[in-house]
Amino acid sequence: MPDPGRPTSTNAARRIDPTALQGDWINTESSPRGLARVLIERRSDALATRALGVEGRTLEGMEWFESLAVYASSSTGGDAVAFIAEHDAGSMPIDLHVNMSKGLLIVSSFQPPLLSAGPERRFAREFFRRADPESPGSSELSPKESAVRPLSSSSAVLTFGGTWRNTNTTGCGIASVSFALTDDGGTLSVQGRDRSDANDWGTATVEIYNEIGAVAEPAKIKASYDLGSMDVQLHGWVKQGVLVLALFRRFKDAIGESSYFDREFFYRTGRHTNSNG
């Protein structure tokens, strides 16, 4: 059944120009936690990425991998401000959630364990500036200590557990989310809000990641939803008692709208308390 709140246009999906994201990007920290450098090239309406890690890798040692999708800043936008890419070959599988803000590239990198009995899932959220043509690039970058302390289940519950309501009560995004811990990680239940009323996104499995180099064991979550005409990739964290969800919405049918990236903010309801700042 068509969504009454969505346009019924038969036009092709809106094209998104990825030009603004391409370039050579250098980590703003002299001792990166996850990635040191990111190269981005435009390939038609997609992007190709090559990332340099900080643990002995060279740019020549990692092949290019293409973006899965690019995203505008709104459903009517035409310029890309974000993309998602996955690299699952070799010894460094990694998922990238990337967006641009105020001239900086924000890269959230998710590293799953190589083996089921391997290390914990690791996460880093880092900021990149465009490389100076005269700069030596990554040769002066050195890795920061990347040890990760395993996140206890009680810590994850304290951080995310319970129900969270959107601070924006009038938008067309998400009304509320609820997190519950499971043996394999957690689940996230989402009550969406279309242009007329709230709607149930259902429950999705959540992956819990430990932040590289963190001293207070902060966690990040990652999940995805298939909503029929749209799929949503998201990740989230809690800062100063507020849950922040970064949402990558991709329309799968030709409705004349742009896939788009945005962030939504939530306050906790119920009895759970958060010990992380």
Tell me the role of every PLM-derived stretch.
Residues 1-33, 46-48, 101-172, 216, ...:
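Amphipathic/hydrophobic helical signal segments and adjacent flexible N-terminal regions
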Residues 19, 26-93, 158, 165-233:
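Central antiparallel beta-sheet cores of small beta-barrel/beta-sandwich binding domains
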Residues 88, 118-120, 226-228, 237, ...:
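A generic structural micro-feature
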Residues 95-99, 234-237:
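Exposed beta-sheet edge/beta-hairpin loop segments within beta-rich domains
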